[in-house]
Swiss-Prot record:
It catalyses: Endonucleolytic cleavage at a junction such as a reciprocal single-stranded crossover between two homologous DNA duplexes (Holliday junction). The lineage of its organism: Bacteria, Bacillati, Actinomycetota, Actinomycetes, Mycobacteriales. Homodimer which binds Holliday junction (HJ) DNA. The HJ becomes 2-fold symmetrical on binding to RuvC with unstacked arms; it has a different conformation from HJ DNA in complex with RuvA. In the full resolvosome a probable DNA-RuvA(4)-RuvB(12)-RuvC(2) complex forms which resolves the HJ. Mg(2+) 2 binds at residue 68. This is Crossover junction endodeoxyribonuclease RuvC. The gene is ruvC.
Length: 188
């Protein structure tokens, strides 16, 4: 499975592509950071991110895109920009029919380091080790994008099992509802 990991941000948006193999084997194919000037208008910054993501999607043709889920931060401006950048990425993937999954920072940290409260240095060290990289990916946005992709590779089987279980449960609920409705109709 080929996964594009995205650490969204307006100033720096980390992009990565990894390929999963047997077991927990993951190979890094590409990583970069899209930068936009903080003094540029918002629409131009989002367009720059969109253009870069479109290029990556066309070049790498991922099976799925994993994006960091935005959570509450003290700085509303930062969280809004991060959410907007993530939305641009999700839209670009959806336009191509590519599945999008969101992972929280603690999910990513737990998947990569075993500790949902790991710091940036610990995440970077584990990403470097897992991918057998010669040097640590920099800046942190690049390491985070790789960590997101690794997290999704490792969580994808569980996500698929959950989706199948939810579909089966919905089927069973509908079957039960139909049976109750038929019984009520027959009783009238």
């Amino acid at each position: 499975m080929r996964v594009m990991g995205v650490d969204p941000g307006l100033t720096r948006c980390g992009l990565s592509v990894v390929e999963s193999g047997r077991g927990r084997t993951v190979v890094a194919l590409d990583v970069d950071v899209v930068r936009t000037p903080s003094d540029a208008p918002l629409a131009e910054r989002l367009l720059s991110i969109s253009d870069a993501v479109e290029h990556w999607l066309a070049t790498h043709q991922p099976d799925v895109v994993a994006i960091e889920r935005v959570f509450s931060q003290l700085n509303v401006t930062t969280v809004m920009g991060t959410a907007q950048a993530g939305g641009v990425v999700a839209l670009a993937a959806a336009k191509r029919g590519i599945g999008v999954h969101f992972h929280t920072p603690s999910e990513v940290k737990a998947a990569v380091t075993g500790n949902g409260a790991a710091n940036k240095a610990q995440v970077t060290a584990m990403v470097t080790r897992i991918l057998a990289l010669q040097a640590k990916p920099t800046p942190a946005d690049a390491a985070d994008a790789l960590a997101l992709a690794i997290c999704h590779c490792w969580r994808a089987p569980m996500i698929a099992r959950m989706a199948r279980a939810e579909a089966l449960a919905a089927q069973q609920r509908q079957k039960y509802k139909d049976k109750v409705d038929a019984t009520l109709r027959a009783a009238r």
